Amino acid sequence: MRRIYLHIASIALCLFTVFSCSVKKNTKLSRSYQAMTTRYNVYFNGIENYKEQLKNMESNYEDNFTRLVHMHPVSAYGNPKETKPNGSFDRTIEKCQKAIKLHSIQKKPKRNQNKMHDPKYREYVKRGEFNPFIHNAWLLMGKAQFYKGDFLAASATFIYITRHFTW
């Protein structure tokens, strides 16, 4: 009988923890939980795909020695006569977008009036993003867009990163 109560209590504790860590709440526990699930679920799959596609792109690209040799295969996107490197970074971009959509915490935390005199705390409260790992997803998305050859989207992503994540 005691084991049954122990199992029920552990399941209830797990459910309570999972449901209390939503992106609509901004507590230390929810930030930690969202950062952990971002890092070890969606971001991990995105970074693994990124590494695989980058290795694919670098190994399959053949230089044309009758023309100017590029330092990196991405440089070939600038010349329409050059062979383009192949690498599908779409899955990486999708994973980053999923991480940002599902795990972004933009709700402001409850203000602690005792800490409002601290300049670091005031800067923290002014942030727009409170998941401590989301900036890595944005950076990976910008790099994937760059290696895909979508330079305008990559530059827009990098500008967004510099505006919102320079703390």
Question: Where do the language-model regions lie?
Answer:
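Hydrophobic alpha-helical targeting segments used for export or membrane insertion
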Residues: 9-17
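Acidic, polar-rich low-complexity tracts and alpha-helical solenoid repeat scaffolds
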Residues: 2-3, 15, 21-167
